[in-house]
Amino acid sequence: KNGVDIGQSTVEEVQATYQFNDLTSFLAVYYPAMDVLQDEDDFHDLAAAYFERARANGVVRAECFFDPQAHTSRGIAIETVIRGYHRAVVEAREAGLSADLILCFLRDMSAESALETLQVALPYKDMFIGVGLDSDERDNPPTKFADVFALAREAGLHVTMHCDIDQIGSIDNIRAALTELGAERLDHGTNIVEDPELVAYACDHGIGLTSCPLSNSFVTEEMKGKEIIELTAAGVKVSLNSDDPAYFGGYIGDNYLAFAERFDRSRADLERIARNSIEIAWISEEEKAELLARVDRFVSEN
């Protein structure tokens, strides 16, 4: 559509580039491909296609990350990004899917860039519900962005952040995210199992973990399934999620299936995880009750 040369000319050639063995190799493919997104319709169409797939997978609540700095850094206005995505959110809601956006900061960019991004995004804060932190974790601890997250909390936004698996300093970053920056959830974050005190903290404070088995499987043989099981047994609210599904080859149903088959999980195990995902969602208590009731009905009827 936009005449952008990304180095491949067919779907098969694009898919052949999806060879990842760590976070760095994934990001090397992930960011250049964004160049095809140029106008508001592009962002809308991308999100709308995702929501359609999510609904087909039985998703009833979707909280989706987006990385505005990956676009503003190449000259795309932040309102183009937010408005395009939000149009798709509104349409998804009209079709019966509860959906919201979470604005993420790129941790391998400066804290000043993150702060500027938040400031220019705040006029649109009715279009997103929270902020997160992602990209290359090496030498980019959460504390680098303490002032940014403090401002976000003051603005009434929810807070989460990636604590990617098996990173140098994982436990220190998890501790800082929870105890210093006020994270309500951790994205990935299963290394928390290495510190019993942090596991207890997560249980006591209702911290949710959004784990992604299929993307985990690209960088570790066991998709962190044993950690998911151990944390769930300890009372941590772990959920299963898709992670850049177009790249990692699986939407939410594929993640549930892969985890269940690899670790011989029962219906009750998967039901608990599904309930966790609702209980840690950033929605009203009334909506949580409605969605949990839908789980009850599904379990009783199937």
What are these regions (language model features)?
Residues 1-159, 166-172, 178-180, 185, ...:
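Metal-cofactor-binding active-site regions of metalloenzymes
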